[in-house]
């Protein structure tokens, strides 16, 4: 069972690419260890909005570790301390009670800051439009009847698929 942690959160705030930026500091209390990093930022934003303050702006899309939109620098490391994981797949159990967690945007001339930790990713669109990506020919999918599956295995697979119908 995960325990709750309390920590100091320092987030980068900036109103645009030419604006001066600064860190704002927040004390986060009793955050469950099974909370994802982005969910923790959602909790911060709920607190900011309830207090009449502007929410912290950050990018995200799928929240399933696929798209990479959630890219942040956390404590000076891309995506934080978890090796090979995107920010949305980083859980608060990776941190300790009393930690200071610093959140910053990607810093690159190619990706100017729009606001806080949201960056302009149109440079990626230009690369894709120019054909600057890798594709792999994987062949065609096998015929559905090429691999025989027992009725028991098919029933079990269907039960599992039905169970995760919520998308969790």
PLM feature spans:
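Signature of N-terminal electron-transfer/Fe-S-associated modules in redox systems
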Residues: 1-165
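Histidine/lysine/aspartate-rich catalytic loop segments that bind and position anionic ligands
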Residues: 168
């Amino acid at each position: 069972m995960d325990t709750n942690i309390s920590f100091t959160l320092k987030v980068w705030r900036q109103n645009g690419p030419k604006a001066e930026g600064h860190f704002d500091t927040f004390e986060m209390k009793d955050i469950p260890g099974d909370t994802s990093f982005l969910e923790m930022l959602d909790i911060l934003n709920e607190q900011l909005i309830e207090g009449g303050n502007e929410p912290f702006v950050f990018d995200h899309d799928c929240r399933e570790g696929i798209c990479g939109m959630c890219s942040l620098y956390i404590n000076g490391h891309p995506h934080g301390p978890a090796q090979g994981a995107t920010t949305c797949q980083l859980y608060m159990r990776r941190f300790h009670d009393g930690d200071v967690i610093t959140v910053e945007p990607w810093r690159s001339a190619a990706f100017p800051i729009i606001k806080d930790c949201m960056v302009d990713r149109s440079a990626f669109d230009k690369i894709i439009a120019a054909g600057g990506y890798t594709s792999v020919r994987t062949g065609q999918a096998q015929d559905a009847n090429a691999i025989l599956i027992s009725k028991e295995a098919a029933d079990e697979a269907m039960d599992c698929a039905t169970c995760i119908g919520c998308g969790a």
